[in-house]
């Protein structure tokens, strides 16, 4: 009888190599979260949670570049945003979108962590260090709360102490790993509806993440461990549209509220993403989405607790730099991933949203007095 031949190499046959990765605890030791950072982070988390629980009538705004590819530009944007946030603080809790990783439909630049020099050098250890320093500067020097997407289950160990908000993208909302991750994070998490525009997976995700879980994870010392969580009661749904559909209008919000009412937790709140499929992937349509949301809020809608906006110093987007040229070949303040609205348009949009919150507040006062 012939035997099946045993290959000389049968494990890791498609792995080209392994390189040492700096442990989260070491990076946190090198770049510590200052008292100033922690004050900003904790306040951002508290304010967001109070809005989600209905104890604060302001709106949350997650606004900033689609992805960060140059820390100095991000700091300049952050300084502008901080000034605006202070001006509108009575109506809006503004959290800077500080995304370090990008999910790709196929392939492409994966973000500041994966390729910090935008030259295919993939110096991930350098990317981690640059990113943590940026988060430290944004929260301590600039004084802004920040948020990011939870794309994998390891990177939060490096940065979660700086975050006041997290999002789970449409491609990963259905992932059990990401639901387990969300159940243990110390800040509010928004789950985007599926890429088809349906709410079911996001509703399931919010409810699953509110419960405790046991799963395999990695400690801050870089050791594999069994992780036990208690559940996250500050999760919500982000309406981002779907293939060939939008879901930010009055009827879509009404349908979402009806779906939520049938859940075990009817208090789940909604945030509207002004970009992605709601803008039909054209950044110039983001103000139109914001206009609709502002009108709904002005009319008393209180299930919408905030918006997401992709914004940069200058509008639009630009192609990746030619091979070998790095970031030096790029235009200043322009996205290299999704198109963004300009700073000037951002100011107009947030001012309009602030006015809508004021109108809703006045409307409620009138109802109480009557």
Curated annotation (Swiss-Prot):
EC number(s) recorded for this UniProt protein: 2.5.1.54
Molecular function, one GO term: 3-deoxy-7-phosphoheptulonate synthase activity
GO biological processes: amino acid biosynthetic process; aromatic amino acid family biosynthetic process; chorismate biosynthetic process
Regulation of its activity: Inhibited by tyrosine.
Keyword vocabulary terms for this entry: Amino-acid biosynthesis, Aromatic amino acid biosynthesis, Transferase
Enzyme class: transferase
Reactions accelerated catalytically: D-erythrose 4-phosphate + phosphoenolpyruvate + H2O = 7-phospho-2-dehydro-3-deoxy-D-arabino-heptonate + phosphate
CC annotations in GO: cytoplasm
Keyword Amino-acid biosynthesis among UniProt keywords: yes
Pathway listed: Metabolic intermediate biosynthesis; chorismate biosynthesis; chorismate from D-erythrose 4-phosphate and phosphoenolpyruvate: step 1/7
Entry keyword NAD: no
Entry-linked InterPro entries: Aldolase_TIM (IPR013785), DAHP1/KDSA (IPR006218), DAHP_synth_1 (IPR006219)
Function field: Stereospecific condensation of phosphoenolpyruvate (PEP) and D-erythrose-4-phosphate (E4P) giving rise to 3-deoxy-D-arabino-heptulosonate-7-phosphate (DAHP).
Similarity comment: family membership: Belongs to the class-I DAHP synthase family.
Name of this protein: Phospho-2-dehydro-3-deoxyheptonate aldolase, tyrosine-inhibited
Organism in which the protein naturally occurs: Candida albicans (strain SC5314 / ATCC MYA-2876) (Yeast)
Lineage, opening ranks: Eukaryota, Fungi, Dikarya, Ascomycota, Saccharomycotina
